[in-house]
Amino acid sequence: MNKLYSVALMCLIGINASKAVTTDAVTLVSAKVPSSKTSLSRTEAETFADTLRNISKQAYLAQYGQAWDDHLILKDSLRMPFSSRTIGERPADGYPIFISLHDIAGTTASVNDEQYQKQQHRYDQTLPASCIYITPRAPQNANDIWQKPALDSMLHTLVNLAVLNQGGNPNRVYLLGNMAGGDGVWHIATRQPDHWAAIATTGGHLEHLNIENLRNAPVMVLTVEDGGNDTARIETAKLCREMDKLQENDTEGYKHQCSSTGNNGKQLEVGEGKALDWLQQFTRNTIPQKVVWQQGETVTGSHYWLSVPATVTPQPGDKVTAEIDENIIRVSKCNYPELNIWLNDKMVDLDSPVTVIFDGKPVYKGKLPRKNSVIEESVFNRNDFGFYYCSKITLLIEVVK
């Protein structure tokens, strides 16, 4: 039976989605837009956003600032020590930040302490002249600890503190990892690709990954050739072919480079130096024209300029594909009953009508107000100093079989 989509849209400004939805709202094809009298101008919205970001930064330092001085990030029962180095003079746009995840070579603290110490100096000969280099120590000694979702927020805190304390650039943050650290890079980046300018892995095993999420997060894959029958090398080759195919079908996305290096010290140094050079050409794009968001085993609530309300529980396999073409927003796939679309003036012209097309059919056209409440929500909920939105549309979707 063909699926019929009944879509209702509301611009939910200053009210929670769950409070705005009634039992019959999803059966309507309509739009609710607040009075334009309450809308900000572009200049007013940008000024208000700057003010809130400054407040957010001060509040963040008050809550987490001691963690930078202590070189220790805490989350529940997890403790993540870290080392940091700030090298050279600060560039005009801020230091690039490199987060480097060490291998987990055993299950004892002493062995992994040694790996942590090695990682602190892994790129001594290849780091750029100006940067912040951070090596976190895995909070546990299990082989898969870097893959755990709890690490996402801990790394986010670490990045924010580097931005606030050392003048790092939140849009030039690069995630690196080797072997088990490389495993972690893949899992972290596919869950939260919008946090990173680019990622790089050396070795590692690649399983159960939603690489479609990496459309806007460039990837460097470095394979270590050691002459053995290495399952990781086979997995890596397969993944690189999959990324080749994704880029072939979507030429503006899925930027990646796959290369190999020898296993001795000098060869690794040269190979990883080239990887660092490749990464630095990229700056994070917080508002890409097109996004692909597919849930994995660990579900997330947001992806670039899309999110789901707290009342919606994402499921593994749920997928959204959306893109913006001037003032037209196209949503071609969506498994959620509700979907938030966040906008600002760099994405669309908010002084002109915006059209939303769902499943090939126009479902809304009109001007969207810039709202204080949306700016507040986008700044304080994400705590990401590179993101800011001033308008929001919520799609209410019912699938009738």
PLM features per residue range, with description:
Residues 182-193, 199:
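Short glycine-enriched nucleophile-adjacent loop
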Residues 220-224:
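Short beta-strand/loop motif that positions the catalytic acidic residue
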Residues 294-401:
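C-terminal beta-sandwich/jelly-roll accessory domains of carbohydrate-active enzymes
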Residues 234-237, 244-329, 334-336:
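C-terminal catalytic histidine-bearing segment of alpha/beta-hydrolase fold enzymes
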Residues 94-164:
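Active-site machinery of serine-nucleophile hydrolases
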Residues 225-255, 344-364:
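Active-site-adjacent alpha-helix of alpha/beta-hydrolase-fold enzymes
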Residues 20-95, 370-392, 399-401:
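A domain-start/cap signature at the N-terminus of enzymes
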